[in-house]
Amino acid sequence: MQQHDICILGAGPGGATAALHLASKGIPCVLIDKAVFPRDKVCGDALSGKVVNELKRIDPGLPALLGKQKEQLPSWGIHFISPAGHKLSVPFKPDYDAAQDVPSGYISKRIDFDNFLIEQVKQRPEITLLEGIGIAKVERDAQGYTLTDKSGEYQVSTRLLIAANGAHSTFARREAGIEQEPAHYCAGLRAYYKNVAGLDKDNFIELHFLKDFLPGYFWIFPLPGGYANVGVGMLSETVSQKKVNLKKEMLRMIESHPEFKQRFAGAELMGDIKGYGLPLGSKKRVISGDNYMLVGDAASLIDPFTGEGISNAMISGRWAATQAELCLQQQNFSADFMRGYDKAVYNRLWKELKLSRRMQQLLDYPWLFNQVASKASKNKALAETISCMFTDLDLRERLKQPSFYLRLLFN
């Protein structure tokens, strides 16, 4: 049996980030994943400015290195299309120059981005990376936890377990008591298409809020090589209540909706349409306990409005590494001491998650969404205000005040 002070279960962006920050502190760990990289992960594939900032925190040179990868596209903004068909184009940076400026966001398939992080992991002697090992049992022991693989031949004992093993983490459910709640869980479908027409020249991602699909949304994200990530998302609660067949609805919109019919006329579906679940951060949860912390999707930290989870996984991975260092320094792995991790994560993310929840709920009022999109599409100053929302939390805070919308509607 191997013994390690710190074991990280799951080598996606959250787990890899935790391992890399530990390595920077000179702290060894073992990082285990059931897959062998590169491996696919069903996702929207968009990397926000927050992801770029977290890469900088790992190593200031990483964003430039990512920018050199042929498997990514720089993205300069988002097109929001309202239920009434108003297009609100929100650049990540006002008055950007795509030829000169450093991109604020990227689009990269998870098979490529996750492997990009794993390549950084492999360069760090402090990290023992174990791929292709499916952990079947996680049991409490006197020191912390013992993990056993499916064959029963591989075992590791650890004083501190960082569970970063995704939306379907058995450990998060059994040990931390995190249940899948339809009101705080999103069902998503993702497909790859080739030759979708009308993609933005600066690779803006598209979020369509279609009248006959609310409160769900339809997305199109451009990818290298003429590909696009195309998908839909809707709260599981709504899917259940309205008995929505997401795949049927997605194909119906692609084949017959006036917004998409011509754009997909010459497009080809590449591979299968795949489903996935998004545990949303619209509710505060206890994400640590005796000898463990939960990171990323295992901690239910996905943004309820945008559906983005990579940046929050990386942020929680960074704070898990900080807490792990304190645990080793103090030789304290108790639940009480571990609460410092919960506090740090929610200090950073809760305002943002709470606000995104409110914005998600605005989709129940399409008339208001239409008014905002219509006004902003004709008002450069207002469009820039909304643009800053993606980087300036104080500004996002203003957007939840009813007076902001009243001024918007009547000025």
Named regions from a protein language model:
Residues 1-12:
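Beta1/beta-strand and adjacent pyrophosphate-binding region of the FAD-binding site
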Residues 56-113:
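A conserved beta-strand/loop capping segment in the N-terminal third of enzymes
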Residues 155, 238-323, 327-329:
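FAD/FMN-dependent oxidoreductases across multiple families
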Residues 120-260:
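Predominantly flavin-linked oxidoreductase catalytic cores and closely associated redox partners
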Residues 7, 23-43:
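Glycine-rich FAD pyrophosphate-binding loop
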Residues 325-411:
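C-terminal helical "tail/cap" subdomain of flavin- and related membrane-associated enzymes
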